[in-house]
């Protein structure tokens, strides 16, 4: 089956993003296809490369990047939600007059159209 995940919880503070990552890994291990992960609302914090967990904590931001690097899973973050929460890439930082970017490599700013397209082309959309 072909899946898309939507993550609305931040990297830390709730279980949503961690559960989504575990689910994503389980899908791939079982031979399913994971087309994309769409981060929305507080979920965009999963793409903030300035997140720096303690040395004894799991680094969820880098784990999402690793999932992308190893499996080619597209990691989309809602551009409107991201800008409201201070997460941006170089292009948006320049356009908004911000001093710098903090989008973790492997993630891409996208509109809700990316989620709509994924929902149309996948068998299941699972929200965390």
Swiss-Prot record:
GO CC terms, sorted: sulfurtransferase complex
Pfam families xrefs: DsrE
Documented EC number(s): 2.8.1.-
GO MF term list: sulfur carrier activity; sulfurtransferase activity
GO biological process: tRNA wobble position uridine thiolation
Compartment(s) of residence: Cytoplasm
The keyword Transferase is annotated on this UniProt entry: yes
Chief localization: cytoplasm
Record keywords: Cytoplasm, Transferase, tRNA processing
UniProt keyword annotation of Transferase present: yes
TM stretches of this protein: none
Lineage: superkingdom: Bacteria
Active site as annotated: 78
Disulfide bonds: none
InterPro entries: DsrEFH-like, Sulphur_relay_DsrE/F-like, Sulphur_relay_TusD/DsrE
Function statement: Part of a sulfur-relay system required for 2-thiolation of 5-methylaminomethyl-2-thiouridine (mnm(5)s(2)U) at tRNA wobble positions. Accepts sulfur from TusA and transfers it in turn to TusE.
Family membership: Belongs to the DsrE/TusD family.
Subunit and partners: Heterohexamer, formed by a dimer of trimers. The hexameric TusBCD complex contains 2 copies each of TusB, TusC and TusD. The TusBCD complex interacts with TusE.
Name of the molecule in the record: Sulfurtransferase TusD
Species whose genome carries this gene: Cronobacter sakazakii (strain ATCC BAA-894)
Gene: tusD
